[in-house]
């Protein structure tokens, strides 16, 4: 997967198109990511010991990784991601600027 937890991304399709956020969680087996503050859904929570009131909560739902684009840290623009081997390590590289994303 070309994104990691903590990366800044821009949503390129769906109801939150054009919005930016940081990756909160990656679900590699399902090819999905959870972006902080985006793709919010209503969850009906039954009362329990942790939340005695219960009610309707807003939570972030996972979205497909193909719907997000990584933001290049050097240019603050969305970019595609490539991979290079540097000193025996696999490093993510921005396709637009050609600079390494992993520092």
From Swiss-Prot:
- InterPro entries in the cross-refs: KOW (IPR005824), Rib_uL2_dom2 (IPR014722), Ribosomal_uL24 (IPR003256), Ribosomal_uL24_CS (IPR005825), Ribosomal_uL24_KOW (IPR041988), Translation_prot_SH3-like_sf (IPR008991)
Q: Does the keyword Flavoprotein apply?
A: no
* SMART domains per UniProt: KOW
| Organism domain of life | Bacteria
- What would be one Pfam family of this protein? KOW
Q: Which Gene3D superfamilies does the annotation name?
A: 2.30.30.30
Q: Which CDD domains match?
A: KOW_RPL26
- Would the keyword RNA-binding be found if you checked this record's keyword annotation? yes
Its subunit composition reads: Part of the 50S ribosomal subunit.
Q: Which PANTHER family match?
A: MITOCHONDRIAL RIBOSOMAL PROTEIN L24
Sequence similarity = Belongs to the universal ribosomal protein uL24 family.
Under what name is this protein listed? Large ribosomal subunit protein uL24
């Amino acid at each position: 997967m070309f994104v990691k937890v903590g990366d800044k991304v821009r949503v390129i399709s769906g109801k939150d198109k054009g919005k930016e956020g940081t990756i909160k969680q990656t679900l590699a087996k399902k090819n999905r990511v959870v972006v902080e503050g985006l793709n919010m859904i209503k969850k009906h929570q039954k009362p329990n010991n942790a939340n005695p009131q219960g009610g309707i909560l807003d939570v972030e739902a996972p979205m497909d990784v193909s719907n997000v684009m990584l933001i290049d840290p050097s240019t603050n623009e969305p970019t595609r991601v490539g991979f290079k081997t540097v000193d025996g390590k696999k490093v993510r590289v921005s396709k637009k600027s050609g600079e390494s994303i992993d520092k």
